[in-house]
Amino acid sequence: MRKLLLIITVFFTFNVAQASLPNIVASVNDEPITLNEFRARKKMIMALNNVESLTPAQDKQLSDLALKSLIDESLLFQYAGDREIPQEEIENAIKSIEDRNKMPHGSLLQYLKSRSVNPDSFISQIKSELIKMNILSSLSRSVQVSNKEIDVAILSSDQKDVEISMQVFTSKDGGNKAFTQMNNLKNRLKKCADVKKSLYDNFATMQIITDKLSKIEGVKQTIVKDLTPDKASNVFEVNNKFEITLVCSKKILNVNEDENNYVVNFLTNKKISQKAQKMFENMRKKAAIKIMLPS
């Protein structure tokens, strides 16, 4: 009898331990994230992704995702402080989601309610996304894209031909002394406009070439493509002599305004994204985040 009572007691204790979860699952700078918020977020994610049931492994992934989103949300709300998100912006964001999913206006919240999801969890996430968008908007004002960056991006796409102007230096012989002299010359080549005949005349010749990149022969085309204006190549052996190419200019041909704007927008968004990612990473590093949810 005593043994039976012990077994019942152990079994009961085990089940209580398994079933119970702390009322606070995490805290962010002493701001609590409650168990109810955590469960509501999980339920919301399942509803929005039309998921009915989960394996234990999937449930673990969902728990991690829900907790991360709540922590990020808390950080964003703390960053925003007392600044309120206007109700009109929230409603417009919900309408935008409904439009993308071809849903009648007002039906999204009704759908969530029909899945027993607390709409407050969804609206809270909408608010945090709007705060994030405001941050991205403010970051965009500090982002600039140079013409050089635009040219590099277009060149790397291999979609447009380029007119290249370059100075090609060729040694007069192929000996070790000539190789040393050419290496010394390479280190002194800074700008095409500053090149003087006295720099190379004793041991090399110089030829100015202007042509389309597509018409330059194989190996030299590869070398030139990777060089920026006023940048000299390494010393290469060509036909038993040594050669250096100094690019003077690159002019991309046949780029219209729409193509140029597309590249500018792409590079701008990339820079904003990189800045935002760094900002959010720093925000997380500086925050006091405690997770009480059992792993």
Curated annotation (Swiss-Prot):
Keywords: Signal. This is Uncharacterized protein RC1023. InterPro entries: OMP_Chaperone_SurA, Trigger_fact/SurA_dom_sf. Residues 1-19 form the signal peptide. It comes from the Bacteria. The keyword Manganese does not apply.
